[in-house]
């Protein structure tokens, strides 16, 4: 007989779904009255102190809250997870009765004169007005144990998925949020989807997602179950997914990150199954991770998860971590100190499994899918540089551009260089005097900020493109005549260059209805 696994934490404190749902309307009333909103908190704290809050530095925030009245009380209560005077909390939360909040599992009373929160209740603005999200406390400002059923709040992964999700629609759409957690994606989806369904394996996540929707007065269908089981037989216009994709051993210590599947099995399940739940023309935006293995191209690995027919895929790798960095990052994320025996035991198993599988790195990024009625086509790319603009609607544009290339003769079309495209000629001093060009590049100044190295012929071709000018074939003919060569020597390179720049939005076909 074996004892309990020392690496598996206990569950989180209990919550009462019905009681929390009853609290949602009066809690929203209190928040609106006090100004407990993203904009209200920024105005009260100021930029510098607000930045300190984001860094998990509570002292400057506490100092500012002293002069911020009821709003300061709620910031300390919910964002700093401080012990707060019970009378001050009662005033700030009115018309919520703190006793009701205690029975629901929102608050606890460590002593008769103070209360503290058991949940993180956080305002945020996703670009379409204020929302609130209810999750478990993450320990960034108050030391807490991260429970096995911990429901993650608003983090880097969830916000990156928000920015990466297409919101452009041609009419009412249905949307599935797979692995909703606390409901961040579902809340965001309500701004552009007519009907939103959210699923999660975790019973606690289902409750908190329902509470998040109720607190925002939004109608979201939230159902419990693993993977796509709760929506078996159903199809949607859009799917977003932030599943427990962490590459691991198959052990489950935290349900928000561990799928119970070996290595990148969770991402494989989601990527391979999502097309079955898309309407024709529907799209999916999936957060995913994949292993890099000696002797195997990561692009081929992810592409192998897709069916041979019926899918367009754009796979975007945003980062790659070495095994030690990957394991250390997720140990700390789970609240473990890597120096402790429990963390050491887990890290030993984790690193041994990665070594056994010849894993050299772990890739992370987005998989965009579109359901079609033709053979599957896959474009997999590295995009590891920083981005200023959201990636979301770019995916729809990429699919449109690939469609255009399938149905047009590239050489016979007219083009224009996108206005945000910059040309760079880098030259170094020539030993014999003057300057010698060492590299030529074109940069896209918006969106994914792609850049391509080109040669002198490529630069000349791009200089000759005009929407009201000559077809590409004629531009190449003129260039060939000027160079004294046969146009057949230049045409393949010109077609390949223009095709690549069309896909990345640096060049657009004449008459294109969209700028990219």
Where are these regions (language model features)?
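Long, charge-rich, low-complexity alpha-helical segments
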Residues: 70-118, 162, 166, 171, ...
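Acidic, low-complexity/disordered tracts enriched in E/D and polar residues
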Residues: 8-73, 141-142, 374-463, 508-516
């Amino acid at each position: 007989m074996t004892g309990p696994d020392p690496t598996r934490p206990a569950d989180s404190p209990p919550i009462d779904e019905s009681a929390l749902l009853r609290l949602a309307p009066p809690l929203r009333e209190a928040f609106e009255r006090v100004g407990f909103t993203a904009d209200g908190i920024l105005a009260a704290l100021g930029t510098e102190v607000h930045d300190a809050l984001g860094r998990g530095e509570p002292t400057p925030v506490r100092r500012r809250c002293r002069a911020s009245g009821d709003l300061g009380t709620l910031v300390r209560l919910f964002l700093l997870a401080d012990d707060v005077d019970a009378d001050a909390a009662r005033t700030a939360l009115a018309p919520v009765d703190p006793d009701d909040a205690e029975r629901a599992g929102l608050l606890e009373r460590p002593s008769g004169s103070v209360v503290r929160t058991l949940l993180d209740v956080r305002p945020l603005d996703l670009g379409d007005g204020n929302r609130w999200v209810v999750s478990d406390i993450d320990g960034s400002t108050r030391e807490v144990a991260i429970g096995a059923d911990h429901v993650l709040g608003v983090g880097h992964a969830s916000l990156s998925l928000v920015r990466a999700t297409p919101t452009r629609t041609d009419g009412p759409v249905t949307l599935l949020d797979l692995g909703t957690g606390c409901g961040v994606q579902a809340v965001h989806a309500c701004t552009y989807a007519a009907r939103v369904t959210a699923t999660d394996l975790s019973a606690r996540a289902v409750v908190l997602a329902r509470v998040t929707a109720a607190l925002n007065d939004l109608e979201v269908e939230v159902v419990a179950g693993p993977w796509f089981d709760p929506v078996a037989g159903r199809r949607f216009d859009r799917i977003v997914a932030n599943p427990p994709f962490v590459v691991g051993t198959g052990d489950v210590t935290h349900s928000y990150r561990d799928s119970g599947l070996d290595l990148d099995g969770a991402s494989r399940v989601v990527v391979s199954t999502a097309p079955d739940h898309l309407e024709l023309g529907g799209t999916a935006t999936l957060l995913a991770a994949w292993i890099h293995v000696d002797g195997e191209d990561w692009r081929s690995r992810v592409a192998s998860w897709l069916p041979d027919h019926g899918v367009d895929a754009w796979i975007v790798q945003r980062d790659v971590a070495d095994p030690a960095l990957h394991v250390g990052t997720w140990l700390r994320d789970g609240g473990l100190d890597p120096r402790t025996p429990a963390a050491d035991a887990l890290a030993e198993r984790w690193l041994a499994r990665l070594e056994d599988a010849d894993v050299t790195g772990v890739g992370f990024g987005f998989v965009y899918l579109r359901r079609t009625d033709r053979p599957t086509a896959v474009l997999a790319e590295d995009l590891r540089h920083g981005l200023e603009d959201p990636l979301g609607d770019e995916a729809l544009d990429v699919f449109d551009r690939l469609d255009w290339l399938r149905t047009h003769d590239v050489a016979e079309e007219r083009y224009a260089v996108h206005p945000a495209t910059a040309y760079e000629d880098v030259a170094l001093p020539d030993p014999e005097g003057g300057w010698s060009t060492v590299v030529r590049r074109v940069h896209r100044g918006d969106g994914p900020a792609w850049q391509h190295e080109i040669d002198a012929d490529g630069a000349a071709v791009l200089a000759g493109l005009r929407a009201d000018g000559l077809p590409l074939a004629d531009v190449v003919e003129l260039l060939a005549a000027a160079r004294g060569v046969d146009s057949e020597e230049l045409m393949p390179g010109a077609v390949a260059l223009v095709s690549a720049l069309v896909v990345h939005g640096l060049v657009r076909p004449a008459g294109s209805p969209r700028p990219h």
